[in-house]
């Protein structure tokens, strides 16, 4: 199904050509959703921007457009408002036809991408020998949501986990473990990840304070990089231990990822330097090899270079990221590469992308996007920390969310004097708890910081996961109470939209394709959350104002269709956020 806004655009594009000639065939008619329902459903703003070019008043341009506009089957008579806006109100008969098409459409009107693209989404990316913390939450959840939406649109998506599995920290850790716990370097599972993290912190202190230790650690890195068998075995054991712990969290959150860590690109680093040199882009600065960039300066206003090879001959994150771009473009054949990391890395990626374009690693037909996000804050407005000032571990945060959800559920069951099985309580608490964490993050504009609050995210009122899940469960309760299987409703039955609440709900249901298209373009998942929240509110108003099971036919079946379409839209939308629905709560 073509999105409603796209259908309207096509009609106005035809009118532009009829009214003002073929020169206007590619002119965007500037159709937007109406800012206020009092003015209709959509608005055309092209008259104001064309007036100067056509040397006419905006209202005259609007009148000419309407004269040649064929839109009677979609809209009521358009109205010219203010200086030249054209207000459009959809016809109930058109809404009924469009909704009828959705009844047998599993995709609920969302078309598949044409053409489909090969897209890489790079997200999560924790560091080996460190536990995942709250900072990884946003990258993991936002990246997964973006990947789900692109996959639903039938793009070919590669989900990559660019784990930090290489570098000086391994020489440091291996050197320390050789002294303190040598069995960890030869035996699988000799340590758990928490112990590894503790040893890593101690190793870092030794590295910073003990010159002999620092030199031994550097030699250990050289041995590792040169392929020394014992060093490689120790490194692989450390990676495997971390990997197993990461996977536990990915399984809990239902995250699918292909690991391709920093070490994967080691064989390609020297070739990157060679290509940059061949193109005359390298400059030596204090023994390091750099690329000077346009528009980047330090505090003194001096040109700021991107270092790609350190003075000691080692490589850095920039070199690895350039090698990754080369591989993703040349081997993966990616047409769009999306990096989901915190906003603090914006400058780094801007520099890397510029070098990649200068060097020809990034052709014009490949888009690279940094999906930046803000911080997770505590209720004190500061970066979320434990009481002791430590970074909050992601596993502990998720466990606490489930515990809070369980406490809320048990309290509600007691107040309702309801008895449920242990399995029901455990599953519901886990689903609601984890969904609340995901939704609280995704419902925020990712550019902003947000305050993490269990109380707010688990609230049954407001823009929260429990509110959405409850709206879905409420529809299913109609099915149970009426002994109705929505799938048994005849697709040949009529859809009748008379009540204002029905019309408002119908219009919201039909906006899903526009919303999915917008999120695919601007990569802002909160748009989908906002849509689902509005849908839930409009359904609740419909439920309050329009009897369903007590209505006479054919109104009853028509309203049952609206209920079913609402439930299906909520289920689909929530699944794209990585949230499963519950039939009962």
From Swiss-Prot:
Keywords: Aminoacyl-tRNA synthetase, ATP-binding, Cytoplasm, Ligase, Nucleotide-binding, Protein biosynthesis. InterPro entries: aa-tRNA-synth_I_CS, Arg-tRNA-ligase, Arg-tRNA-synth_N, Arg-tRNA-synth_N_sf, ArgRS_core, DALR_anticod-bd, Rossmann-like_a/b/a_fold, tRNAsynth_Ia_anticodon-bd. GO terms for biological process: arginyl-tRNA aminoacylation. A motif ('HIGH' region) lies at residues 126-136. One of its GO terms (cellular component) is cytoplasm. Its main location: cytoplasm. It comes from the Bacteria. Signal peptide: none annotated. It is found in: Cytoplasm. It is an enzyme of class 6 (ligase). Gene3D superfamilies: Arginyl tRNA synthetase N-terminal domain (3.30.1360.70), HUPs (3.40.50.620), Isoleucyl-tRNA Synthetase, Domain 1 (1.10.730.10). Monomer. Belongs to the class-I aminoacyl-tRNA synthetase family. NCBIfam families: argS. This is Arginine--tRNA ligase. It comes from Microcystis aeruginosa (strain NIES-843 / IAM M-2473).
